[in-house]
Amino acid sequence: LGSKGTKKFEIPTRIPNVTFEIPPSWGGYQPVSLRHDKARQLYFWMFPATGKVGHDDLVVWFNGGPGCSSLTGVLTEEGPVKFNNVTHKAEPNPYSWTNLTNMIWVDQPAGTGFSRGQPKNQSMEQIAEEFNGFLLSLYQTFPKLQGKRLWLAGESLSLIHI
């Protein structure tokens, strides 16, 4: 999914206090618009498919909200790293959705989790417009994502704007 131009988004495969290497991934900020409002940026963390299938698909995951960080999903539910509630340690997640598809977790709308900028949205339509701008920006930064089948998934209130 990465290319020469996406190197600055690469996440190290070694993370402090995690005793194993995580799969290659990319994370960072993308603006909600290609033309203006660069101050409002959504945070994302993206992992490529690791299995034999799913390389032509891209699933974007949203945790509840609006206003719930999707990092909860990547670190406690569908991601390749899962934090154990008993041992309080990170461990590989054998049931990660990355076994089946390319995955992106997004903190949205702006102002949620690690995303930047003041929340301005007054409606679900405005949240969708902001996400669309983010997605166009992401496709521009990661051209290998263009042409992949896009799937939107989530839980709780996120299902209203999916």
Each language-model region and where it sits:
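Conserved small/polar residues in nucleotide/adenosyl-binding loops
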Residues: I160-I162
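Aromatic-acidic/polar surface patches that form glycan- and anion
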Residues: T19, H36-D37, M124-I127, E155
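Alpha/beta-hydrolase fold nucleophile elbow
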Residues: L145-S156
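Hydrophobic alpha-helical cores of multi-pass transmembrane domains in eukaryotic membrane proteins
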Residues: W105, S156-S158
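N-terminal cap/lid subdomain of alpha/beta-hydrolase-fold enzymes
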Residues: Q41-E129, L136, Q140
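Catalytic-loop region of hydrolases
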Residues: L1-L58
